[in-house]
Amino acid sequence: IKFLKKINNSYFYSEGNRENLFFVIEIAKILKIKKKNLLKTLKKFKGLEYRQQIIFKSKNLTIINDSKSTSFSSSASILKLMSNVFWIVGGLAKKGDKFLLKKKNCKHLKAYIYGKNKNTFINELKNIVQYESFTNLKILIKKVFLDIKKNENLKHKTILFSPAAASFDSFKNFEERGKYF
């Protein structure tokens, strides 16, 4: 546990990335990699683009590009860890996908919904989170920043671009969607 605290890399905050970290640590033990070398590498590890990628961080605002997220479960894993989240969600919903976080876990969460299947997202989220819907991502992003400005008193705000959907309604792929964001 002491070793984990020394890593201090926000990339490993999410459940999935933490599981990968534990796997890497176990492999490093088997391969007899020196702890100081492993620590040095893990501290500066950035991960892959568009996968819970922190693209901006200041004292009170973090912006995360998780364009790779194509299901509610992939978005929920990171949503569970945060408060004061401005969540950008939408695109082509996966059939039968369900949002499993409870209302009590979503008190400090607002969803900004867009995309071809926005009504599917609205129906899934309407009784759980506060939300607004938009015709396109460009208008939505402007509104997120207006809301951020209106809520200046909130500490540690996060803009989370984690669409929980496929990108093909507006983009060629999740990479193009991530670049656009």
Q: What are these model-derived regions, one by one?
A:
Residues S10-H108:
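Nucleotide phosphate-binding/pyrophosphate-handling subdomain across enzymes
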Residues S74, T120-F121, S170:
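Phosphate- and divalent-cation-binding pockets in alpha/beta enzyme and binding domains
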Residues I159-A164:
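Short beta-strands and strand-loop turn motifs
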Residues D97-K157:
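C-terminal helical cap/extension that packs against the catalytic core
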Residues E176-F181:
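Short, basic/aromatic-enriched C-terminal tail that caps enzymatic domains
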Residues F168-E175:
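Glycine/threonine-rich flexible loop motifs
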Residues I1-I7, I54:
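Acidic-glycine-rich active-site phosphate/pyrophosphate-binding loop
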Residues L31, Q130-S133, S170:
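A structural signal for short, well-ordered beta-strand elements
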